[in-house]
Amino acid sequence: MIFIKKLWKFYQKGGIGMINGIKIAPSILSSDFSKLGEEVIDIDKAGADYVHIDVMDGQFVPNLTFGPPVIRCIRKCTELVFDVHVMINKPERYIEDFVKAGADIVVVHSESTIHLHRVIQQIKSFGVKAGVSLNPSTPEEVLKYVINDIDMVLVMSVNPGFGGQKFIPAVIEKIKAIKKMRTDIDIEVDGGITDETIKVCADAGANIFVAGSYVFSGNYKERINLLKLKAK
C-alpha cells in the first residue's frame, strides 16, 4: 500500500527526469529553523521544484540536522517533491521511517553502507525514487554495478556537513563521466551552487541543482528564477 500511494503521489508531482528540464532544490539547511514551515511554503511559492532535506547524524558528517519527525511536520506545508539526502552511517536502519515521513526521493551515500545495492532495493521497495551520492573525493567508478538500478546520482561539490561552502571545480569531470556511464540518469549537484557555478554544471550534464545559502540569502523567487535562467 505504501508503494502504490508513494508512486502515484510522486508521478502526480511530475517525477524526475531530463524530460522535465532543469530543477532547483533549495536546501532548507540554510533556512531559518525558527520558522521552518513558513520557509518551505515560501520557496514553494517562489518556484522551487524540490525541497532538499539534509539529514545528518554527527558521525558520517560533522553536523546534526533533521530526522523523520521534522520531515513529517513540514510535509503538511507543501506538495513539492521531498528530496531527502541521508548522510548517516548505516542508512538502511531508517529508510522506512523517512518514506513514511514523506520522502519522495531518498539519496544515500555510497560511502555510508557496505551493502549499497541492498539499500537501493530497500528504498525502491517503498515506491520512492532511489539516489546515490558521492563525496568529492569518491570516484564515479563505485557506481558501475548500481547505476542501472538508481534514478539519480547526487554529486557533492563541497565536503558534506555544512552549508555556505565554496564550489569544488574538480567535480565537473565527474559529472561528465557519470553522464557517459548512463545518458538518461538524473544528475544532481549539491554544494556552492550559485548563478556563477550552475552553468558549468549544467553544461557537464547535471539537471537538478541544490542551492541553499544562495537562495535563502536573497529574494527567493528572483534567485530561483536566475538559477533556472543561467542553467539553460
Summary of predicted features, one role per range:
Residues 129-133, 137:
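Internal catalytic-core helix/loop-beta-alpha segment
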Residues 193-204:
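Acidic, divalent-metal-coordinating active-site segment for phosphoryl/phosphodiester hydrolysis
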Residues 208-211:
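Acidic, Mg2+-coordinating phosphoryl-transfer loop and its flanking beta/alpha structural elements
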Residues 80, 128, 182-185:
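A short helix->loop->beta-strand "cap" motif at the edges of active sites that frequently abuts
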Residues 14-107, 111-115, 122, 130, ...:
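Conserved N-terminal beta1-alpha1 strand-loop-helix module at the mouth
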Residues 2-17:
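Short, Lys/Arg-enriched N-terminal segments with co-localized hydrophobic residues
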